[in-house]
């Protein structure tokens, strides 16, 4: 297997070693946890390859060897990085931070490259596992976008030397050093990394970064990024930035200054990470923070914007002319947010109703409402005993979650537990909006795990069975999204989702939900518990009946489910043959979509072998 390079079993052992590495408890906690979680997603892929036989053992093994080699390098690099990064203190030097930040980028890029070269045609990989691989790839790609791109052509030879403790100066020549420092600044402080900007890292490393790099990196994009960064760096080097404009944590010009409970001002991304790592004190004064509210410092932001304009320095996006969107709107919204904490039930009810209306109108309003600190207060109102307040609060959270950056703020506020409580015991309208909110939040891959473990799935299944038509739709979309993550499939089966879905296939009054039911079943069908439940519910005749309809998407999903159920099961293959599956499958193999044709052809081939 793997061209003699390595066996899947040995890589599974390597992943097990990675999982057992204690997580960093300092500034790298999230980076290490994210990388470990993404590596874990590869477990089922390697198990399936280990247990399967190559489709074409005579095929050339060059592509197979290449991807196995890339995967080995990436996983070994991940293990080394996680083993060393966990020892880093929060007060590590800025130079060390840039080096380890670059190493996280290299490991991320190498793993994504390996998965992009996976030779699907050489292995019998199920749709379920394929979806997990794509999930891991999408997470790695997003991480790469946050870190920035690599330029292996220009830096490969320079980076082949061990990295020195005091920075990059002993590694590359002056011109290359200038560019690499610019890259590191971009990797560390780019606009997209605000929520996950890389923290300080270890002081020394003998890891050769060229080990992670290859010649097909995004060179052109990097050049543009580096040149722009270098030009701006030259401008700022000639200026003395006012001390009050620098974040005390990063010592960088602040883009989004916020005030903490002690009155000190910090860059939002850095103080948020400081708090997320479990710190309870102000970094500068070491006083205990009475609360973790981050209040935007609009006066300082305006001064920074004006100073940037006067010195011809590019201003942070969104703050041009010293204003954030519309200052008048912001004043109104901040006043409404304050009223959310009023002692008067009626005042709270009216305020949340107005915020609901504003949050529905535009993206700008959703941004302003979040910046005004509304999200934690709205989350608290989800448990309000006043029905109208609770309904409006969950709808506000739903509307705010539409804006991508607000999703993380909602999760940070610990909203999931309260949303699930509304889903279980709220009014029908509140339950519907709670389900829709979980769907919106679950669009972020890492949230699927958190939501699945919160007890949301049984409540969603109950809404799927007993809700209004709209509630059923909201529950179905949320369940589909959550079940993409392998660990949630067993939870859904135990909650009785298969019974609910099968009823939708056979109940004529629910014909409008057939599409949703089939889509979810097609995702579940590769789970062993789900497979047993589907067969036990005598679903095969219903699936054959759907194959005979003219609904292309439904036929395609029915074929996918049948393929999962009947693979390696001669008895079931003979059964569906007797039920009349051959004729509609032949039609689908000729007239269906590409996916439908592929499923139909595979199923027909299995039927042919079963009848021999």
UniProtKB/Swiss-Prot annotation:
Family annotation (SMART domains): ARM, Ubox
Domain U-box, chain residue ranges per copy: 240-314
Catalyses which reaction(s): S-ubiquitinyl-[E2 ubiquitin-conjugating enzyme]-L-cysteine + [acceptor protein]-L-lysine = [E2 ubiquitin-conjugating enzyme]-L-cysteine + N(6)-ubiquitinyl-[acceptor protein]-L-lysine
InterPro entries: ARM-like, ARM-type_fold, Armadillo, RING-Ubox_PUB, Ubox_domain, Znf_RING/FYVE/PHD
One of the Pfam families matching this protein, by short name: PUB10_N
GO molecular function terms attached to this record: ubiquitin-protein transferase activity
Keywords per UniProt: Coiled coil, Repeat, Transferase, Ubl conjugation pathway
EC number: 2.3.2.27
Enzyme class: transferase
ARM repeat windows: 363-402, 404-443, 445-484, 486-526, 528-567
Coiled coil: 127-196
Pathway linked to the protein: Protein modification; protein ubiquitination
GO biological processes: protein autoubiquitination; protein ubiquitination; regulation of stomatal closure
PANTHER family: U BOX DOMAIN-CONTAINING, U-BOX DOMAIN-CONTAINING PROTEIN 11
Function: Functions as an E3 ubiquitin ligase.
Name this protein carries in UniProt: U-box domain-containing protein 11
């Amino acid at each position: 297997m793997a061209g003699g390079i390595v066996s899947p079993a040995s890589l599974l052992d390597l992943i097990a070693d990675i999982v057992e590495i204690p997580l960093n408890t300092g500034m790298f906690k999230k980076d290490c946890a994210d990388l470990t979680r993404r590596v874990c997603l590869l477990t089922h892929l390697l198990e399936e390859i280990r247990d399967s036989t190559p489709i074409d053992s005579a095929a050339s093994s060059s592509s197979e060897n290449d991807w196995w080699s890339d995967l080995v390098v990436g996983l070994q690099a991940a293990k080394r990085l996680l083993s060393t990064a966990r020892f880093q203190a929060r007060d590590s030097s800025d130079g060390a931070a840039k080096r380890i930040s670059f190493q996280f980028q290299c490991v991320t890029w190498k793993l994504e490259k390996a998965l992009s070269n996976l030779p699907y045609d050489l292995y019998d990989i199920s749709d379920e596992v394929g979806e997990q691989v794509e999930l891991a790839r999408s997470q790695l790609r997003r991480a790469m976008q946050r870190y920035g791109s690599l330029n292996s052509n220009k830096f490969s030879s320079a980076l082949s030397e061990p990295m020195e403790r005091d920075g990059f100066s002993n590694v590359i020549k002056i011109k290359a050093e200038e560019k690499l420092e610019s890259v590191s600044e971009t990797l560390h402080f780019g606009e997209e990394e605000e929520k996950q900007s890389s923290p300080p890292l270890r002081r020394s490393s003998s890891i050769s970064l060229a080990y992670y790099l290859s010649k097909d990196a995004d060179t052109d994009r990097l050049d543009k990024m580096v040149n722009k960064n270098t030009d701006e760096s030259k401008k700022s080097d000639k200026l003395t930035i006012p001390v009050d404009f620098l974040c005390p944590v990063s010592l960088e010009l602040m883009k989004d200054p916020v005030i903490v409970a002690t009155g000190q001002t910090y860059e939002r991304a850095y103080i948020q990470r400081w708090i997320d790592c479990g710190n309870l004190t102000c970094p500068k004064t070491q006083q205990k923070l009475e609360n973790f509210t981050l209040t935007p410092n609009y006066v300082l932001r305006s001064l920074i914007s004006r100073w940037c304009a006067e010195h011809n320095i590019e201003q942070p996006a969104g703050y041009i002319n010293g204003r954030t969107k519309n200052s008048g709107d912001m004043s109104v919204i901040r006043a409404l947010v304050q009223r959310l904490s009023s002692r008067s039930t009626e005042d709270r009810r009216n305020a949340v109703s107005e915020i609901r209306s504003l949050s529905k109108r535009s993206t700008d309003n959703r941004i302003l409402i979040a910046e005004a600190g509304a999200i934690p207060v709205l989350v608290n109102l989800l448990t309000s005993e006043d029905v109208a307040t609770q309904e409006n609060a969950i709808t506000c959270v739903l509307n705010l979650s539409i804006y991508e950056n607000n999703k993380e703020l909602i999760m940070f506020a610990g909203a999931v537990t309260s949303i699930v409580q509304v889903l279980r015991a709220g009014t029908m309208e509140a339950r519907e909006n709670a389900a829709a909110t979980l769907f919106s939040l679950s669009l972020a891959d890492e949230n699927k795990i958190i939501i699945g473990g919160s007890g949301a799935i049984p409540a969603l299944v109950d809404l799927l069975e007993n809700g209004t038509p709209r509630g059923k739709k909201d529950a179905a979309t949320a369940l589909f999204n959550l079940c993409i993550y392998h660990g949630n499939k067993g939870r859904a089966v135990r909650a009785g989702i298969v019974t609910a879905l099968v009823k939708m296939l056979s109940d004529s009054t629910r014909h409008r939900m057939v599409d949703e039911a089939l889509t979810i079943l097609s995702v579940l069908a590769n789970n062993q518990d789900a497979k047993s439940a589907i067969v036990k519910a005598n679903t095969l005749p219903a699936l054959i009946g759907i194959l005979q309809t003219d609904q292309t998407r439904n036929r395609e999903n029915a074929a996918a489910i049948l393929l999962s159920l009947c693979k390696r099961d001669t008895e079931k293959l003979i059964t569906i043959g007797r039920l009349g599956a051959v004729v509609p499958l032949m039609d689908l193999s000729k007239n269906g979509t590409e996916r439908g044709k592929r499923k139909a052809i595979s199923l027909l081939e299995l039927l042919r072998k079963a009848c021999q």
